[in-house]
């Protein structure tokens, strides 16, 4: 019988000290979802880089720090030793900062964008705190909140309105995030809940191969790594194209 890796995720560092804070940020996934904001902004007719940068900063605070701090408060899925009061403080300050960026940006540029601030706040709290019995903590809401919404916000922050390209880009974000969720669900299950794996594969030539925990999730984790890199490279290519 083989045991899964002691790490709760493929990007988690060894526990302790500053490494816990790096792991808390989910670096590849944060970069993945910030790329959606960039993609949305680059789909706009003309790119205002300052406003796009502000949108990326807001999502870096809300998703990269705030959402992940709230998630870690619930059951310690990353097994960090960060004190609960510190996680609460990180969540409150980062989410408040993201909201402040949104409010100031909307007042300075396009007042209707204020609507997106409470929507984003609701999505962060409802998903990560599993409000209403976890109704919003589902694959679909993950796709909408972490895939579609960032694209919409990136486009709106730059263009000041919403066009067909924004909604098509949002659909791309939703579908790709759903694919991410399908892959990561199995990986998280094995890494965080399974304590042992026993089995073997019998090939048509009679040869037998041992089935262990690492083999169970190797394909999914390789796909997640490649998808994370793909989205970041796509966002970078779109920035280079629009410069």
Question: How would you name each of these model-derived features?
Answer:
Residues 1-126, 144-243:
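Hydrophobic alpha-helical transmembrane segments
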Residues 129-141:
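Membrane-helix interface "capping/anchor" motifs
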